[in-house]
């Protein structure tokens, strides 16, 4: 019984870390899958690239779906992990991340639909065949714009997670500071020109935060005794 109780928070932390690792890896693989296929301002070249590398394009979409599914798993596991610190804030963080996941899944349609249109899967009678590449490129241009929106919700999520990590006694406070800083950076997309300008720096900070948190959860986990102490204190307050 004691061993099971001790293993539970550590197992939750490591499952969260593994899910996060899968999320980061598949998200990066999806980016590389689409790289070089979309030519800005050239619908014909974009259509040619997509049709010539249709399997690669579909693989990128599959990676996006896996990334979203693993992110939902992270959401549930983070809620359980940080619930002893503050249940309401842990729920709020989960809420923000689920909204981000929903927006991300919606944005991926702007990768799938152009492939279907160009491949003739769904012929559009109201659009001439020579206009299809331009329509496909227009739809593809909406994906990064939608991405800017779900990044904002990830920003809110990371700010709350950063605070919870900092207030916890079972994880290093430095991870909390890093997560909050990454979240505040993501919130710069509330002013799109600023977010676009800062994107290279934000991406590096965001990736550093995710990798640091992921590796810590997988390799070290949490301080089980302190987690249980916070859990008992939370139960007493309730």
Task: Put a short name on every predicted segment.
Residues 1-238:
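Hydrophobic, aromatic-enriched alpha-helical segments typical of multi-pass transmembrane helices
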């Amino acid at each position: 019984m004691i061993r099971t109780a001790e293993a539970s928070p550590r197992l939750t932390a490591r499952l969260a870390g593994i899910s996060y690792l899968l999320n980061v890896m598949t998200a990066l693989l999806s980016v590389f899958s689409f790289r070089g296929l979309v030519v800005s301002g050239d619908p014909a070249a974009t259509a040619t690239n997509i049709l010539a590398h249709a399997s690669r394009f579909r693989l990128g979409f599959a990676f996006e779906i896996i990334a979203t599914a693993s992110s939902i798993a992270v959401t549930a596991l983070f809620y359980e992990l940080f619930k002893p610190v503050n249940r309401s804030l842990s729920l709020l963080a989960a809420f923000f991340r689920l909204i981000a996941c929903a927006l991300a899944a919606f944005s991926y349609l702007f990768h799938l639909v152009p492939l279907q249109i160009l491949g003739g899967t769904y012929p559009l009678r109201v659009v001439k065949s020579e206009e299809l590449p331009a329509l496909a490129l227009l739809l593809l241009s909406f994906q990064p714009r939608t991405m800017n929106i779900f990044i904002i919700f990830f920003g809110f999520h990371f700010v709350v997670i950063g605070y919870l990590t900092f207030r916890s006694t079972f994880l290093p406070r430095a991870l909390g500071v890093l997560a909050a800083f990454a979240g505040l950076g993501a919130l710069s997309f509330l002013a799109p020109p600023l977010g676009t300008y800062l994107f290279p720096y934000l991406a590096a900070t965001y990736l550093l935060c995710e990798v640091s948190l992921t590796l810590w959860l997988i390799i070290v986990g949490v301080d089980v005794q302190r987690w249980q102490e916070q859990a008992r204190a939370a139960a007493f307050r309730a």
